[in-house]
Regions:
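Acidic catalytic/metal-coordinating carboxylates
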Residues: 34-37, 60-63
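Active-site beta3 strand of CheY-like receiver
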Residues: 45-51
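Receiver (REC) domain active-site loop signature in two-component systems and cognate sites
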Residues: 56
């Protein structure tokens, strides 16, 4: 079981992710709707894994990823992005993202990405 922080400005995406993760035995310890809030919750709670939407208001997922990796270079972050954002995905790899999931996401893909990281913890 992993402790997971879900960062996404879409209430629907957060709800789906939370339900899916909990169904698979993981604990969603917090949610955030903006990247800067996600970063602050990361610093406070130190989750095992962060799922991070790329496109969010104020501080986007790429900026939040950089902040989290600056705080802890070993942080495990799964980026979630809309299809067609190849340049954003390249940036996220540059800044240390562990996995990518494309919206609309396939539930099995999410579980596979989480389990891959859990196995390496």
């Amino acid at each position: 079981m992993a402790k997971i922080l879900v960062v996404d400005d879409s209430r629907t995406s957060r709800k789906i992710l939370k339900g899916l993760l909990e169904e698979n035995g993981h604990e969603v310890i917090a949610e955030a709707v903006k990247g800067d809030d996600g970063y602050l919750k990361y610093k406070e709670l130190h989750p095992d894994i962060v799922t991070m939407d790329i496109t969010m208001p104020v501080t986007d997922g790429i900026q939040a990823l950089q902040l989290i990796k600056h705080e802890n270079e070993k942080a495990r972050v799964i980026m979630i992005t809309a299809a067609g954002q190849k340049e954003k995905m390249i940036q996220a790899v540059k800044y240390g993202a562990d996995e990518f999931i494309t919206k609309p996401f396939d539930k099995e893909e999410v579980v596979k990405a989480i389990n891959k990281i859990v196995e390496s913890l």
